[in-house]
């Protein structure tokens, strides 16, 4: 991971793994935090997490999300996401708009995107890292 980038945006796949206490992402997040990285997520990821919330996970989910900086989707980010989606469609590659909003958020803030779904974010402008 590029040491000049001091922020890491956690994608929904990583948040789910943290909620399920999978060892690899928990250890990685702990290390990133100790190394001084800002740990963040997007408002889009928050919506995705709450949409798939299981009964009994409410408090644990709130606790996890409260430890992260939540980056909003601004009009500039929304436009960037639309531009990326349209450009990818023109070359025959389709991506979900919600994923492109997450990608645009990471790009706009200069954050590395931590995801377990690299194929969803195959765009040249973004730095990806996997747990």
Per-range role (PLM):
Residues 55, 116-119:
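Short, polar loop motifs at secondary-structure junctions
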Residues 1-41, 50-66:
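Short, well-structured N-terminal submotif of metal-dependent ribonuclease cores
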């Amino acid at each position: 991971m590029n040491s000049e980038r001091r922020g890491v945006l956690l994608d929904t796949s990583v948040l789910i793994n943290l909620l399920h206490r999978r060892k690899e992402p928990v250890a990685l997040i702990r290390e990133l935090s100790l190394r001084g990285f800002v740990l963040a997520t997007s408002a889009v990821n928050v919506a995705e997490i709450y949409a798939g919330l299981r009964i009994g996970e409410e408090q644990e989910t709130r606790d996890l999300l409260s430890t992260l900086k939540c980056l909003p989707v601004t009009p500039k980010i929304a436009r960037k996401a639309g531009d990326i989606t349209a450009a990818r469609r023109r070359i025959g590659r389709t991506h979900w708009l919600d994923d492109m909003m997450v990608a645009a958020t990471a790009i706009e803030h200069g954050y590395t995107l931590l995801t377990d779904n690299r194929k969803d974010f195959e765009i040249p402008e973004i730095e990806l890292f996997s747990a």
